[in-house]
Amino acid sequence: KLIECYAYEDFEGNLEEKLEKKLKEQNVEFKNIPLEDIFIEKKEYQKIIHSFISTALTIINLSKNNNINAEELLEKSKENKNAYLLADLILPLRKTYDNYLYETKQIDFADMLIKAEYYINDDLFKNTFKYIIVDEYQDVSSSQYRLLKALRNNNDFKLFCVGDDWQSIYQFNGSDVSYIMDFQEFWGPSEISRIETTYRFSQSLIDISSEFVMKNPKQIRKSLQSKNMDNSLAVTEIKGFNTKLSIKFMVDRMLELPKNCSVYLLGRYTFDADLLNYDSRLSVKYNTSTGTQKVYLENRKDLDITFYTVHKSKGLQADYVFILNNSSDFLGFPSKVENTPLKNILLEHDDSYENSEERRLFYVALTRAKKHVFLIVTKNRESDFIQELENTYGYSQLNDFYCCPKCGGKLIMFHGEYGDFLGCSNYNLNQCKYTRKINKKA
C-alpha cells in the first residue's frame, strides 16, 4: 500500500512527523534501530558518511580561510535553502571545533594565518623582508594571499613564486587556482619564466597528459619537452567485463613487470584500496610509521608496490602507475560529487569549467609514472575521462601494449618462420631478445 506525501510538507519542515502519523494509522510497526548500527551494517552508508565528513571539513576550511565565523556562515547562506540547510547542519560542528581550540588554548593553521594578518595590519609586526619566495604557489588560499598582501603593504619586497596551475588540486583545503592563473591581476606587472623541460617521464606521456589537461581553456598554455624522446604510447587501458576481472587482468600485468621496479596503485578515494580485495594474490598492509598502504603481490616480492590516493601521491613518482576505478560511478574518477551551493558561496573566484579540479587531479595521477600508466576500466562503465581518451587516441591503440618483463619495453608482433610471435621493441636499441608465443585462444 502506498502512503501519499506532499512536497509542501518537506518545505514546511513537518514531513517526517506527518509520515509517522500516516504509518501509525495503517498499524505499521516501528522498530528503533540505532543510527550507527545502520551505517555499520551497510557499506554504502559508510561512503555517505565519508562524503559528509569530507563536505563538512571543506566548508569549515573554506569558511575559516575567508575569516567567516559560524554565525556569519549561516547568515551568508540564508538566500539559498539548500545552502542554509547544510550550513545549519555543519554549524554545531564548527562551534564545537572552535570551542575545543579555545578551551585547549590551541590554534590551527587557518588561525595562524588570520592572526598573522591581524598583527601586520595593526602594525604589531614590521616586515623587514626584502625577498619572499613562495613554493607550490598553485595551492595558495585566500588567507595566504591576504597575508602576503598585508606583508607587502606593510613594507614592499620582491616576490618570487614557483607553481604549476595544472597541479592545483586542493580546493577542498581552500586553495584558489585563480591566484596563479591570473597572477598579474593580483600582483601587477610581473616577469614570467617557464620551466618547460622535464626529465621525469617520456615525451609520449607529456603529450597525452598535456593535451588532456589543456582541454580546459582556462589553464595556462604550455609546451613541455622531455629529455626522454620515447614516442611509444605511454598509457594503456586494462579493461574487464566486471570489476573482479579488471583487477585480475591488472594483477596479471603486474606479474609481467620488470624486476625490482616501483609501482603505485592510485585511487580517487581511500576506499578504492578495497578493490584490491578482489584478487587473492594481493595483500595490503598499513604501515603505521609512514602512514602508507603497502601492497604485496604473490610470487613478486621484488616489486615495491604502494597504494596512494592521488592527492597523497602528488610530488612522488614510480616506474609504473595503475589508476583504479576509472568508472562512471558517482564516486568514480572523475568523482561526480558536485560543489554544494554552500561551497560555491564560499569560493571567491569562478572555476566553472566542467570537472576542472578532477581534470587536474587526473593529470597529476597520469604524471606520477616514469615509464607507463595503466588505466583500470570496467566495460560499459567507462568514465568520462576514459571515453575522452578513447575518442582521442582510439580504443585499439590504448590496448595494444604488452610490457616486456625483461627490460620494460613494448612487446610488438613479429612474423617469423614458425608463425607470429611477440618481441621486444628495444631489440635494436639495447639488444633485448625477449620473445613470447602468441596465445591464439586469448
Feature map (PLM): residue ranges:
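Conserved helicase NTPase motor core
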Residues: 79-179, 197, 315
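Conserved RecA-like helicase ATPase core segment
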Residues: 145-235
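A basic/glycine-biased coupling hinge at the interface between accessory DNA-binding modules
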Residues: 1-107
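Inter-lobe coupling/hinge region of RecA-like P-loop helicase motors
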Residues: 189-197, 218-267, 305
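Short metal-binding segments enriched for Cys and/or His
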Residues: 428-442
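C-terminal accessory regions
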Residues: 326-400, 404
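Core RecA-like ATPase module of SF1/SF2 helicases and allied nucleic-acid translocases
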Residues: 255-357, 361
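Short cysteine-rich clusters marking metal-coordination/redox-active sites
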Residues: 404-407, 424
